[in-house]
Amino acid sequence: MNKVIVTGGNHHNTYGVIRALADKKIKPFLLLVNEDSNSFLLKSILLEDSYVVKTEQDAISFLIKNCYEFNGAVVIACSDGMSSALDSSRNVLDDFYKLPGTKEQGRVTTLMDKETMSQLGVEVGFNVPKSWLIRSVNDIDCVEYPCITKPILSKDGHKDDISICHCRKDLEKVIKEGSCYEYQVQRFITKDFEYQLIGLSLNEGEIVIIPGFSRCIRPCPRTNTGFLHYESLNRISAPIEKCKSFVRKTEYSGLFSIEFLRDNKGVDYFMEMNFRNDGNAICVTSSGTNLPYIWYLANSTLGYKEELSHSTFHSVYVMPEFPDFESFVYTGKISIIKWIKDIIRTDTFMVFNLKDIKPFIFCVKRLLKRFYRKFLVRTN
């Protein structure tokens, strides 16, 4: 039986994959990329074992060093950084591990470039917002406002690099103070809502599985993670076939998500594709289709078709309880009564899990300590 290595950061994205595999009685090995070992993930009873490294390159070194011990292991990437690192080391790792990505080393990292993705999106017929590639303030004369800035490579940027700019002065500030050497600046679209198509590609896009779509009800700032409703594809007019064509053109195999924004006129705009497990993907598992497990089966001798044929679908509400509380309840943007009502209708939380309660308790303690420190600062 093949082992499974789940690798990524200290995030509910990684935990979602661990939980999905646990539903099928598989305990994965966690290769955690984190500055220290103070992680809620390490409190989980759903792991076979774990190892903590500080950087993605350290993770690659670990995989190379332990390639015979883990020979044949199925790898699942849960961050842009790890997806790119695996891609950049494919020629070294491919003989020992079942990797997500493409057969060509470096191709996924090239595809992560937002301008490259936009061009590919145009080729398959997506609506793509007008954009500009910006390296310095000398490049911004042609930009139209309002606009939104994004790191050209998500793995290289921070949340603060994503900003809505209403004038030249705003844009200059982001470029001068931001952490990126290069930005994609897009025309800002007034949205009605945003949605994701979370899926799995097998055999370089020969088979593309997209069970439903996630509609974000209350997005947390600077991220597409938020209180969401996962629904049937019958409830939205989405460019599914174009998405499958897009994935085939990338020649990618593995877990993915494709993000869209629908404007106030009903037009859908392609935002980007994530070449990894998505942070919201627990909604797909909760709805009845276990994509991480199907990826595991497709890369083992067990076969995946029976599992796929037995998959069901029901709509679910999913909440990232800690970011949602901090972003909306703690700041007073929504009332505690409203939040409790949303909790009551939530089917799945991104950390709270009765089968594995210690990670949740750890996060509660960490949140209370942070609030206490803020209280001390205010009173002093």
Language-model-derived ranges and their functions:
Residues 147, 208, 269-272:
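Protein kinase-like catalytic core scaffold
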Residues 253-265:
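A short glycine-rich, hydrophobically flanked beta-strand micro-motif that places a catalytic Asp/Glu
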